Amino acid sequence: MDIRFKQVDFTYQPNTPFEQRALFDINLTIQDGSYTAIVGHTGSGKSTLLQHLNALVKPTKGQVTIGERVITPETDNKNLKPIRKKVGIVFQFPEAQLFEETVERDIAFGPKNFGVSDEEAKKLAKKMLDLVGLDEKYLQHSPFELSGGQMRRVAIAGVLAMEPEVLVLDEPTAGLDPKGRKEMMEMFSRLHKEHNMTIVLVTHLMDDVANYADHVIVLEKGQIVRAGAPQEVFQETQWLKEKQLGVPTAAEFAEKLVAKGFSFEQLPLTADQLADQLLKKMQEAGEAK
């Protein structure tokens, strides 16, 4: 299922003294099965764009097409519920939204709200808990007895229990330690690769974009200022620094080598790419002797 934006503007509190325009002429396509990262400073419009992905808000101008459903400023708010099932959003610190007495009941809440039987909802809860890497023994535990990382996995399982086609992640690793962040990002990568799930990642961590995304969109003041494959967008390291977006760690290290006379065919963005290019250079140097 593709999601397409066509000439989308969005304004908060239009026609009031508090009017604030958040998005300007957004044109983009999030392709079915893709892994798209959205980056930009606080206030760049990332969260507003994110809320258009499952019609939590409607465009002030233009249209958003979600699968076969076209959302315009005139779209009735009724019957938008099916979209929320197709596009699941995991907001920052989703564990704050846990509320049920047991993990099972929390995960099953969404499906039951969409008419799934109690028995089927319990099956989904067990399946999704396994999918996020937690043992079924936790099903009857209170979610509030779990660690912070486990609580976040339970909250994500609750979104996955809706069986969405698109999973939208708003800073999903915020507050996690490096090990927890790595495990979480690998989990999303498995969902993408093994279940062909479309992933949209909002993040400020350029290493995660370089390691996992196949497309990146850069927002600034409500406008798209760059879009393309990470390997293309992140080659412009000076531009990234000027925009204070940060540079992937491997690219930053590679630039230091370049400053000392080393050359790369293409600036590596990940540790694997850096290692591969260094090994190739060493082999070439060995053959030249």
From Swiss-Prot:
Keywords of this entry: ATP-binding, Cell membrane, Membrane, Nucleotide-binding, Translocase, Transport
Keyword Nucleotide-binding appears in the UniProt entry: yes
Positions annotated to bind ATP? G40, H41, T42, G43, S44, G45, K46, S47
GO MF annotation: an example? ATPase-coupled transmembrane transporter activity
Q: Which GO terms describe its cellular component?
A: ATP-binding cassette (ABC) transporter complex
Query: What is the topology of this protein in the membrane according to its UniProt annotation?
Result: Peripheral membrane protein
Domain ABC transporter residue range list: 3-246
- What is the protein's quaternary organization? Forms a stable energy-coupling factor (ECF) transporter complex composed of 2 membrane-embedded substrate-binding proteins (S component), 2 ATP-binding proteins (A component) and 2 transmembrane proteins (T component).
Please describe what this protein does.
Answer: ATP-binding (A) component of a common energy-coupling factor (ECF) ABC-transporter complex. Unlike classic ABC transporters this ECF transporter provides the energy necessary to transport a number of different substrates.
- Name of the protein this chain belongs to: Energy-coupling factor transporter ATP-binding protein EcfA2
Provide the species name. Answer: Enterococcus faecalis (strain ATCC 700802 / V583)
What gene makes this protein? ecfA2
